[in-house]
A protein has these predicted regions:
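Extracytoplasmic
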Residues: 1-190
Length: 190
C-alpha cells in the first residue's frame, strides 16, 4: 500500500460518460487520525482508495474529482463502485456521501443487506461476495460551471472506493465499468 499520491487529475468525458479510477482524484483531505491510502491492484482494473487505519474516525475526510465533457445536461447518474466490505461495526450498514458542484450531499448505505440473514443470504450476500464489489447509483443535479467537482465523503471507516462513473446519458453497464476517460494534470498540481 502507498500513500495517496499527488492528485490534480481533471477528466474529459466522451459520448456522455466519464469513467474515473478512484486513485486518480483531484484533491484529497485526510481525517484527523486516518490518511487516504492507495491500495494497488485492488479492484477490477487498477487500485482503490481507503482511509487507514480502519480503526479511526473518518470526520472531515473526502476525495474530490474534477471532470468536463458531459454536455449541457441538467442531471447525471453517478455510479460509485466500492469493495464489498461487510458491516463489521454491525450498525445497519456503512455509509458515504456523494455531492456534485457543491450541491446537497446524498447519503448511500451500500451494505445494509450484505449479511447472512435468511432473507439476504442467497439474494444479496452470495452474489455480492462473488462480484467482490458493490455499485450504487445516485442522480445529482449538474451545476453550470465546468469542470465539475464530484466529492465522496466516507461516514464510516473501512470503505474502499474503486471507481466512479458519471453517466450523462451514454453509459452502458459493463463488468469493468468502462475504460478510464482521458485525463490531464491541472497546471501547478505537480
Amino acid at each position: 500500500m502507498a500513500a495517496g499520491g499527488q492528485g490534480g487529475y481533471v477528466f474529459e468525458g466522451s459520448d456522455g460518460v466519464v469513467s474515473i479510477e478512484a486513485e486518480h482524484y483531484f484533491c484529497k483531505r485526510d481525517a484527523k487520525e486516518a490518511c487516504w491510502t492507495n491500495i494497488p491492484h485492488m479492484g477490477r482494473t487498477l487500485g482503490a482508495m481507503a482511509l487507514m487505519p480502519y480503526t479511526k474516525p473518518t470526520d472531515g475526510a473526502e476525495l474530490t474529482y474534477k471532470f468536463g465533457g458531459i454536455g449541457g445536461v441538467k442531471t447525471v447518474k453517478v455510479h460509485v463502485v466500492v469493495k464489498s466490505t461487510l458491516d463489521f461495526q454491525v450498525k445497519g450498514g456503512m455509509t458515504y456521501e456523494v455531492s456534485l458542484d457543491g450541491g446537497d450531499a446524498v447519503s448511500v448505505n451500500f451494505n445494509s443487506r450484505l449479511n447472512e440473514n435468511p432473507e439476504n443470504v442467497h439474494s444479496v450476500y452470495y452474489p455480492t461476495v462473488a462480484r467482490r464489489v458493490v455499485e450504487s447509483t445516485v442522480t445529482l443535479p449538474v451545476g453550470p460551471d465546468s469542470p465539475h467537482t464530484l466529492t465522496l465523503r466516507p461516514k464510516d471507516p473501512g470503505i474502499v472506493f474503486e471507481k466512479v462513473v458519471v453517466d450523462a446519458g451514454g453509459y452502458v453497464p459493463q463488468f469493468l465499468f468502462g475504460k478510464e476517460s482521458g485525463k490531464r494534470v491541472a497546471a501547478g498540481r505537480r
